[in-house]
Amino acid sequence: SQSLVLSSPPARERHGRGDVSRLGEAAHCLLILVEKIKEIEMMKVILASGSPRRRELMEMLGVACEVRPSGAEEIVTSAEPEKVVEELSRLKCLDVAEGTEGDSVVIGADTVVAFEGEILGKPKGIEHARKMMRELQGKVHQVYTGVTIAVKDMDAKRVVTFCDCTDVEFYPMTDGEIEGYLALEREGEAPVWSDKAGGYGIQTAFGTKFVKGIRGDYYNVMG
């Protein structure tokens, strides 16, 4: 079978307004769309998410944005990962867009991990996180990110939604390694695994040590 590529962040390249990490197809399309809108209509860009990783990605794209997390209840009608993230990204985006006055570009996103047909969101507690790590270690799983962009212009609203999927492979992990990871804490904050789909972040020390490789967009896994 075809092996997965190494999981280190992509090399940096020149792109428009400055040094930006090499982008996956979805992120590249997002950058082009947002830049064209800003150039033509000088709209403000609003990120409908409180995720620090998504804010970091926008900064990497060179796009200044206002962070305005959605407060909408997350209700989905599908059990398919790609449809779930598309539904939730659209829900978040439109929730914020409805409360936004003036011309704007609102971006909503949602990420889930899927393993053998089961959707893994953020861990509900340490036992849930432990179960996730034991399931994922030594195997390949999928990370789905859905993105919705709503463009509000002169009382008209245009909305586009898309999804990207990346395969991620973990090295085998011992029980001791899993427990060591679960014990990691951030000073004054929640445990490192608590706010991430699947209980891990590829851009963290965990990703460097335990992610064997990926097939697809690195930044899709980042969120």
Language-model-derived ranges and their functions:
Residues 2-10:
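Extreme N-terminal basic, low-complexity initiation segments
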Residues 36-37:
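Polybasic, lysine-rich low-complexity intrinsically disordered segments
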Residues 43-46, 80-223:
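Anionic-ligand binding patches
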Residues 6, 21-22:
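Short linear segments in intrinsically disordered or otherwise low-structure-confidence regions
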Residues 43-63:
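N-terminal beta1-alpha1 ligand-phosphate binding loop
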